[in-house]
């Protein structure tokens, strides 16, 4: 993300928390909609989906305020860096902790997701490389 006028402030932290909260809510409501639909509650599912769409727009509002949306090359790089963090640091650490605490099956799931995140990073970096060839 590009630096914003909020850099280093509590307001920046609040914007980041708002983005994370709205993003999490969107995902939860999407999952809730799927469950309601499977149980035959079409109207409830539709309400969850409508609310999820609202949460998506709220998240976008805060993400844009944080200059989180760049041009396509910047977005590919940001995505690649995020995926790199997830597979090299986040999920690796989660797996080690789960193993240490005796949750070996969960540790294995963390490692499997890490491998997928690595693939995501590779795809984004390949696309970024291809994009750079177009702009030469």
Regions of interest found by a model, annotated:
Residues 21-29, 48-62, 80-87, 110-124:
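Alpha-helical transition-metal enzyme core signature, strongest for iron centers
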Residues 69, 73-84:
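Short gly/ser-rich anion-binding loops that grip negatively charged ligand groups
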Residues 134-136:
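Conserved small/polar residues in nucleotide/adenosyl-binding loops
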Residues 4-16, 97, 126, 131-132:
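Solvent-exposed, well-ordered amphipathic alpha-helical segments
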Residues 14-20, 31-33, 77:
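Short, recurring structural edge motifs at helix starts
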Residues 92-131:
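A mid-sequence interfacial segment
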Residues 2-10, 25-46, 64-72, 94-106:
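Helix-loop segments that flank and shape redox-cofactor active sites
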